[in-house]
Design a protein with these regions (language model features):
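Active-site glycine-rich loops that stabilize anionic/oxyanionic intermediates
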Residues: 58-61, 125
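Conserved hydrolase catalytic core segment
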Residues: 117-156
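Short beta-strand element of the alpha/beta-hydrolase
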Residues: 50-58
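Helix-rich cap/lid subdomain of alpha/beta-hydrolase
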Residues: 2-10, 150-214
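Catalytic active-site module of serine/aspartate enzymes centered on a nucleophile-bearing elbow/loop
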Residues: 271-305
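Alpha/beta-hydrolase fold catalytic core
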Residues: 1-51, 75-77, 116-117, 297-305
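Conserved serine/cysteine hydrolase catalytic core
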Residues: 205-267, 273
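Active-site loop/oxyanion-hole signature of alpha/beta-hydrolase fold enzymes
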Residues: 33-38, 43-45, 67-74, 81-122, ...
Length: 305
């Protein structure tokens, strides 16, 4: 099928438009690694000799969700943004195995294969849950933790809004339909920013229609992972077991993570603190890239690394 011009803004142009400060030669390399029985794709930025920051995206997203953050940080840090199982260009899991333990196994195996240790672990939403549970269980590997708009308990209304959005956009006839519906869902983003994001998140089917790259089991009406009371209680226990310095980041306009739960999250983390980013919803790094970068930089500068 012929390649199409989908109207997305080139990364550096989009970053400048969003006010992101970066070095002009900052571009990622794309790699693959066999780990935990699957083939994982990742984007790598910066020098391997610098402190590694591992970035874990949210449900339905890809490693490119972190492009702005990686651009801003890669002059001082070695960034590895991972396509988690079932997402982006990584393998889908056999038998739809997307449990917390499976994700933890992935992170451990990827770090081992890439020779990474003493990391800063950063995760958004689903990736945030994977990050704080991993930090609790592998304390020797995680020097610092950044959890973005995520906690053991989320606001059901906001989570349901996201689920309706993805369920109603399983397969559409044109790329333009995805652009229009995404703009309605997140009016904070410009059309060109949305196009750039969708270029990385969608794939074209042989019949010419478009769909999401990630495993459709995530957008099944029956898919409600990690919401049972037992699992929520287990995750709060994990939060209390995180030993490293930790930052909780909430978008001021988030309908997914409440201010009350964000405050509880920061309080129950033994070395936790909270930052609220204005002009941002759930997808904080893309909604307000400069605001997100400011709170991350302030945190990293204030802790012993």
């Amino acid at each position: 099928m012929a390649e199409q011009d989908l109207g997305g803004m080139p990364l550096h142009e989009a970053a400048r438009a969003a006010g992101v400060q970066f070095h002009e030669d900052a571009i990622p390399s794309s790699g693959f690694v066999e780990a935990n029985g699957l083939r994982f794709h990742y984007l790598e930025w910066g020098k391997p000799t610098d402190r590694p920051i591992i970035m874990l995206h949210g449900m339905g997203q890809t490693a490119h969700s972190w492009d702005f953050a990686a651009l801003a940080l890669c002059d001082r840090y070695h960034i590895v943004a991972l396509d988690q199982r079932g997402h982006g260009d990584s393998d889908w899991a056999p038998n739809a195995e997307y449990s917390l333990s499976a994700h933890q196994g992935d992170i451990a195996a990827v770090l081992s294969e890439l020779g990474l240790d003493d990391i800063v672990l950063m995760g958004l939403s689903m990736g945030g849950r994977n990050a704080f549970t991993y930090a609790a269980d592998y304390p020797a590997q995680v020097a610092a933790l950044i959890v973005v708009d995520s906690a053991p308990e989320l606001q059901q209304s906001g989570a349901d809004t996201i689920r309706r959005f993805v369920e109603n956009m399983d397969v559409l006839d044109t790329f333009e339909e995805f652009v229009v519906k995404t703009k309605q869902y997140n009016p904070r983003r410009s059309d060109r920013q949305i196009r750039g994001s969708l270029t990385n998140n969608l794939k074209q089917l042989p019949d010419g229609r478009w769909t999401w790259k990630y495993d459709r089991v995530f957008r099944s009406p029956d898919a409600k992972p990690w919401t049972s009371p037992d699992i929520v209680a287990q995750m709060w226990h994990k939060v209390e077991g995180v030993q490293c310095h930790a930052l909780v980041v909430r978008g001021a306009g988030s309908t997914v993570l409440s201010q009350k739960t964000a405050e509880e999250m920061a309080q129950r983390l033994p070395n936790g603190r909270l930052a609220v980013v204005p002009d941002a919803g759930h997808l904080v790094p893309g909604d307000n890239p400069t605001g997100f970068h400011q709170v991350v930089e302030a945190f990293l500068a204030d802790i012993p690394l």
